[in-house]
A protein has these predicted regions:
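Long, intrinsically disordered, low-complexity segments
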Residues: 20-25, 40, 54, 78-80, ...
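An aromatic- and glycine-enriched ligand-binding surface/loop that stacks and positions planar moieties
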Residues: 22-85, 191-194, 210-363
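Flexible, polar/acidic helix-loop-strand segments at domain edges
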Residues: 92-99, 325-407
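Conserved, well-structured interaction surfaces
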Residues: 43, 47-61, 65, 85-157, ...
Length: 519
């Protein structure tokens, strides 16, 4: 994807053209553009359209300060927002302490980008004709991607407008569909896509960013799990597991490095590029052509106070510091391997790597004035690591190329364990649960729902799943108390769903706020 994604720029203006042509509100011919029905005739054109759907994932997850990764991660208890102070990036601080509103820009960005992806997928699905095997496959990819985009929406916002075609001028105002209707469409799209998708092994290495049969089956299993349809969820995950296409990578510490991208454990990733950006050519402001993962620079140890030593962890801009609670969770389980792969303490930075953090010399994180959000730990997992960027051409700060892992096999095994346990298949659940723990040398433990909850917290730390897990388990109100660095934020009933962005309500006269978020 990292090489091929540049071709997507050929498609960049097409979506607007498609809608304009579909509206048919001009009675004069428009010269220099293609009518909607004249596109996607060739396999090359269709590939450009499908790749444009994948491109939305880059834009959604790492567009400078507006990132779906941030929206999913910061409300959980894994990290603090951090930054220079409580006034640095207010939208981040609001996510951290539950003071966010329908005006929050990262939330708005996340909602908007999912509909950009849906719009692009709809163009492919509604216009392309599957008259060759390659076209049939690409239409299936678009359906699976549309299902993924809608799953992100329904799991975060609940009922949302269900748009399945390119809207005419009178159709932009659309009321919410129910969550049940959204899930029904997700399963319909996946059921139609799965028979026509290749296995992961049938893709060439450079094409493994694309939807595979196993990816779609995993999305299906996850959707059923969120619906609490446990036998159906277990069956979908079983299709992934018995395919023999995937396994656990042997070394957890290397899982989130560039060297492991699209590897043995990977089902679905957002691909990024090392592109030689410098301070003169980096494009801030949500430019959709950006190819790098700027998030990791935003979230590296704040360079004002930090020296690397031999740790390999480069300085950044100080957001997303791990909480002490997260470190304590690893310790409580005796989970040395994953702790060492995920976080680095200030004490170890000094004693093992010869680096330094020039404040809090006594390791007392309450010393005044404290570094905002800092409780003694840095992230190594998805960290600002020297191995993940280049300093020439360009500058190291702007060229992180680490992919975001959206679905990986350990997550599938833990979701399968949960679905099987709650469906009454205890021995199957035990096997999948134990397999994940074996990889990191943890002793055999009886599988229970509480044990799975703990295992997901540790295995999937900093991957953006914790907050939605707590919500679907009904644990968020009990766990997410005294949140934020000031310990003054609390999860409330309304936080079970993110707010519908104010801009969406303004632009769609039939849109209504989510419960508790205003009139």
């Amino acid at each position: 994807m990292k090489k091929l994604i540049y071709k997507i720029s050929l498609f960049a203006g097409l979506a607007t053209v498609l809608i304009s042509c579909a509206d048919d509100f001009l009675d004069k011919p428009v010269y220099g553009v293609l009518a909607a029905d004249d596109y996607f005739k060739t396999e090359e054109e269709l590939q450009e359209g499908v790749f444009a759907c994948y491109d939305v994932l880059q834009w959604a997850y790492t567009t400078d300060w507006n990132s779906m990764y941030v929206v999913k991660s910061f409300p959980a208890d894994e990290t603090h927002a951090g930054g220079g102070s409580d006034g640095d990036q207010p939208s981040y601080q609001q996510l951290d302490d539950f003071s966010y509103t329908a005006e929050n820009k990262p939330i708005e960005h996340s909602f908007k980008t999912m509909y950009f992806g849906i719009m692009r997928a709809n163009a492919v699905i509604n216009i392309a004709v599957g008259d060759t095997p390659a076209k049939v496959q690409m239409i299936a990819e678009a359906k699976a991607l549309r299902a993924f985009f809608y799953f992100e929406l329904v799991s975060m916002w609940g009922g949302v407008p269900l748009r399945l075609a390119l809207p005419g001028a009178s159709e932009f105002a659309l009321e919410k569909s129910t969550p049940e209707q959204i899930y029904a469409q997700i399963h319909k799209d996946l059921d139609e896509a799965i028979p026509n998708l290749p296995k992961k092994s049938e893709y060439s290495p450079e094409m493994r960013f694309r939807m595979s049969k196993g990816t779609a089956q995993a999305i299906k299993g996850k959707a059923y799990l969120y619906q609490k349809k446990y036998p159906e969820s277990a069956a979908a995950f079983e299709d992934v597991i018995t395919s023999t296409e995937y396994d656990l990578a042997p070394d957890y510490s290397k899982l989130f490095l560039k060297e492991s991208e699209y590897g043995l454990e990977s089902l679905f990733e957002v691909g990024y590029n090392i592109t030689g950006y410098d301070w003169g050519n980096f494009q801030w402001g949500g430019n959709r052509s950006m190819e790098n993962n700027i998030n990791w620079q935003l979230m590296g140890p704040r360079g004002d106070y930090y020296t690397t030593g031999t740790s390999g962890l480069l300085p950044g801009w100080g957001f997303n510091y791990p909480t002490a609670k997260m470190a304590q969770a690893f310790d409580a389980e005796g989970d040395v391997i994953r702790k060492n792969a995920c976080i680095l303490s200030v004490a170890d930075l000094r004693t093992k790597y010869g680096g330094d953090w020039i404040v809090d010399k006594n390791l007392d994180w309450t010393e005044a004035p404290p570094v905002w959000g800092m409780e003694g730990y840095f992230r190594l997992k998805y960290g600002s690591l020297k191995s993940e960027t280049v300093a020439s051409p360009g500058v190291a700060e702007l060229n992180y190329g680490t992919n975001i892992r959206l679905i990986r096999y350990a997550d599938v095994l833990l979701m399968a364990a949960e679905a099987n346990l709650l469906a009454g298949n205890v021995s199957t659940a035990q096997g999948y649960f134990t397999k994940v723990r074996d990889r990191v040398d943890l002793p055999v433990k009886t599988v229970t729902l509480d044990a799975i909850k703990t295992e997901r917290r540790l295995e999937l730390a900093f991957e953006g799943f914790r907050f939605l897990d707590l919500i679907r388990w009904g644990d968020a109100a009990a766990v997410l108390k005294n949140q934020g660095f000031k310990k003054n934020g609390n999860f409330a009933e309304k936080h079970n769903l993110y707010p519908i962005p104010s801009a969406e309500i303004l632009n769609n006269s039939k849109m209504t706020p989510n419960p508790g978020w205003g009139n």
